[in-house]
């Protein structure tokens, strides 16, 4: 299967933001992984290209998880939250992404 390189503008829309949670922090410390919220139509190669473009790091592999939206009630009305997609990005040894902003 050949990989089609998307243009830089469309790759900017793939990553929606980092996932900052207890599980994501434990995974990051233990396995050199970073967790991102990604667009619903993104695939593994899109995520890999976007991370390498934005953060200037080398990506080893990508695992993607589809999360179903939770059912919620608002009074007598039932609905659900939107479905989401997360990507677990394995970085090559020695690579690191730091999300903390430095104050000057």
Curated annotation (Swiss-Prot):
It comes from the Bacteria. GO terms for cellular component: ribonucleoprotein complex; ribosome. Keywords: Ribonucleoprotein, Ribosomal protein, RNA-binding, rRNA-binding. GO terms for biological process: translation. GO terms for molecular function: rRNA binding; structural constituent of ribosome. Belongs to the universal ribosomal protein uL23 family. PANTHER family: 60S RIBOSOMAL PROTEIN L23A. Part of the 50S ribosomal subunit. Contacts protein L29, and trigger factor when it is bound to the ribosome. One of the early assembly proteins it binds 23S rRNA. One of the proteins that surrounds the polypeptide exit tunnel on the outside of the ribosome. Forms the main docking site for trigger factor binding to the ribosome. This is Large ribosomal subunit protein uL23.
